[in-house]
Amino acid sequence: MNELHLRVYTNRSELVLPDGTIQYFQEGGMNQAAKIRYKKIVVELSTGYLERQILFCRDYSSNLDFLTLSQAHKYLLDRLVQSVTSEVGRALVGLSILQLCVKAIEPEQSIRLHKGSTATKDFSWRDGISMRSLDRQYITPMLRKYELLRLNADGFMMTRSLAENYPYSSVYKANMRGARSEWVSLVEAIEKDEVISEVALRYLLSQLLNQADNFRRLALQTIENLTLFLRATVINQGISLSLILRHINQSDYAARLMEIAMHSLMQAMQEYQVFPHRLLKPLSQMRSANKKHGNIGDIELLEDRQIVEAWDAKYGKSYLRDEIEELSEKLEIHPAVRKAGFVTSLEAERIDELMPRCNEIEEIFGIFLEIVTFKEWVELQFDRTLAQETATEQELASAWLIAYTESLAQRRRDIAPIDDPCYQWLLKLNETLTIE
């Protein structure tokens, strides 16, 4: 038996399987057979193939039959779903759904070849198809519509690690985070016709639907527990801050929760018209506070569609020289900014060393620049609200907790479109409220 390996040439790749079988993948524009297969796949997906499968799994679950699916293959699919966290796993689940759809619609199409084009400037396999186009137009929109996966609207195939110019196999070397080995095993099983693709697709969709139902029940329970907590407690700034801090520090991916907590407080302030002439910008996706997205910070207030106030959350980071220089570059293209700042989870280090540069930036751009801890920032916002006399401390503290909980419960997607999976965060918050 050979060891599975990939041979790469200037115009082709050759995947050598353990039994000596060689699969040839010629590079170049899509051939006529690939175009015909691709058209068939597009027609099926554009006329609702995936949506029909989702609705069948949701509305006729008693008619589902998974007897043809082995325990080993069920395990692979279960592990894919279980691997999804707020940081990893979503792209591989989305890709698995896409590959199963493709194979169910057109069994002759290889699901290893994820790029296909007629344009000579683009990399393409002659037998490949554009999985990125299929994802963006047909897969991600359906998964988002039925809340099966929290995905960016651009689609999971925009993930760089899925776009290498090599066929998908166990020797695909990109750094894919999540249940990589399970996904690889699934690809091999599909290509060997060891699974019936439509049955596997329905099983995977059923597991995602179960998870979605569980989330909705947990969201309702957490909101009910918060209501009971607020009725039984005379709430103030300290109590709400303590509860939210405890939740952040006991949860995974605390940096993202700190952003959500800050944005939630601003939501509460907006509800009480603390800044009546400004508009809170909807929460951005994780890691999007950069020049490419036109952001200055994680939290932004707009006036006449221009950013006038921005705060950037820095969890676990206390020395901010690089961040200050990045802010200076961003301010050059955002002349309307009047206040900007960094909010740290730790006390800022070597602040005396940074102050001259901060003062210089204030002078150049005519802004107020602040570096404060999360606790100090919360105090500033409460003081700001009380000075406006639009809400009492108790009202704002309660509204903050409500906004934070409802944001995580996916009840505020217009202002807080959180695409991170929130189940574990919500579970921990529910536990925290129950203890309180």
Task: Name each model feature, range by range.
Residues M1-E191:
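Terminal, charged accessory segments of proteins
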Residues E3, R7-V8, N249, I260-E436:
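Catalytic core segments in nucleotide and nucleic-acid processing enzymes
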Residues M30, L50-E51, T159-A163, N236-L243, ...:
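Short amphipathic alpha-helical segments, especially helix-boundary/capping motifs
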Residues Q32-I41, Y60, P141-R150, V195-Q211, ...:
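Charged, low-complexity, helix/coiled-coil-prone segments
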Residues A33-K39, G48-F66, R202-S206, N210, ...:
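N-terminal/domain-start segments enriched in small and hydrophobic, helix-friendly residues
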Residues K74-V81, T140, R180, V184-E191, ...:
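Generic detector of well-ordered alpha-helical segments enriched in charged/polar residues
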Residues V88-L92, D213-L220, V274, A416, ...:
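Residue-level signal for secondary-structure boundary elements
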Residues D154, L162-R287:
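The feature marks a conserved, polyanion-engaging helical scaffold used by nucleic-acid processing enzymes
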